[in-house]
A protein has these predicted regions:
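Bacterial N-terminal signal peptides that target proteins for export
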Residues: 1-7
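C-terminal motif of bacterial Sec signal peptides marking the signal peptidase cleavage site
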Residues: 16-18
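Bacterial signal peptide processing site
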Residues: 20-22
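Flexible coil segments in periplasmic/lumen-exposed cytochrome c-class electron-transfer proteins
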Residues: 24, 42-43, 65, 101-104, ...
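Periplasmic/extracellular electron-transfer cofactor-ligation site
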Residues: 24, 39-40, 55, 61, ...
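Electrostatic cytochrome c docking/interface patches
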Residues: 27-63, 155-156
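Solvent-exposed, polar/charged alpha-helical surfaces in well-ordered, non-transmembrane soluble domains
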Residues: 58-69, 92, 105, 109, ...
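Short Fe-S-cluster ligation motifs
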Residues: 98-112
Length: 156
């Protein structure tokens, strides 16, 4: 019983910490962004085995809603995320050419392994391969920025 409370308290603390951070300097952002872009993202040739169906797209949207919206917003474009502009490097817009240029295999690799120093956590072991591939499918079909509101956790 104490473990779930500890986990919830830790997650809440991590989310609230982001709300108190000052925006990074331009130099800091450039250095961290440069470093992030030097990371070799693997799995380039892997193909998404999850077929594009309404059911699989809904599963990807649901998994994204559970694991990704706290940082990336419902639309994948950080809408309503209060600390998005204070992260160093800034959280990427998941519809941006910089993100969408990745192959499906590379997107899965990023979700599996995370990216340091960006703060993107690794999900390997937390999510099944099918869940990750469904999230990748969802990332290819994100709604327009601001069209679906902001995460409920930040709207109060």
């Amino acid at each position: 019983m104490r473990l779930p409370i500890s986990i919830a308290a830790t997650l809440a603390s991590a989310l609230l910490c982001g709300c108190k951070v000052s925006a990074p300097s331009a130099v800091e952002s450039r250095i961290v962004t440069f470093t992030k872009h030097q990371i070799t993202v693997g799995n380039k040739s892997a193909r998404n085995p999850v077929a594009m169906t309404a059911e699989n797209l809904a599963a990807g949207k649901e998994a994204f809603g559970h694991y990704c919206i706290a940082c990336h917003g419902i639309d994948g474009q950080n809408t309503g995320v209060p600390f998005a502009d204070r992260m160093s490097p800034p959280l990427p817009l998941l519809t941006s050419p910089d993100v969408q240029r990745y192959t499906d295999g590379q997107l899965k690799w990023v979700i599996d392994n995370g990216i340091s120093p960006s703060g993107m956590p690794a999900s390997r072991g937390m999510l099944s391969d099918d869940e990750i591939w469904s999230i990748v499918l969802h990332l290819r079909h994100l709604p327009p920025a601001g069209s679906v509101g902001e995460p409920e956790m930040y709207s109060h």
